[in-house]
Amino acid sequence: MADLYVGLVHYPIYNKRMNVIAGAVTNFDIHDISRTCRTYNVQGYYIIHPLEVQKQIIDKILSYWQEGYGKVYNPDRADALSRVLWQPDIASAVQTIVERTGKQPYVVTTDARIYPNTVSYSFMRKQLQEGDRPVLLL
């Protein structure tokens, strides 16, 4: 079975005017997605953002729940948040997976549109169930 990793990309993204922007990290991005990742045994959850100020926000929230009063108050949350890693860009997230597993991951992005390199759900399910190459879902 292949290892699954999730990455939430905050840059580069498009706003409603189709300008490239960096989105802000939210509490939801950190807490809720990390709990879902824990539930489905995702090996790592990367919050991808290039701005140092956003990394500081992520670090502060993680520190509270993993080292501060939050860890005592809700130890399950600390466990879920242990999968969260900040990376400045997608290439850095891919590199950490290569270093961890020794294998180049499939990088899969979601989109409602169909492209020439679009793969089916059944193809990716088979890769996860039968493959040994990690998958990074963005």
Show the residue positions of the predicted features:
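A short, acidic, amphipathic alpha-helical segment used as a generic capping/interface helix at domain edges
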Residues: A91-V98, T118-L128
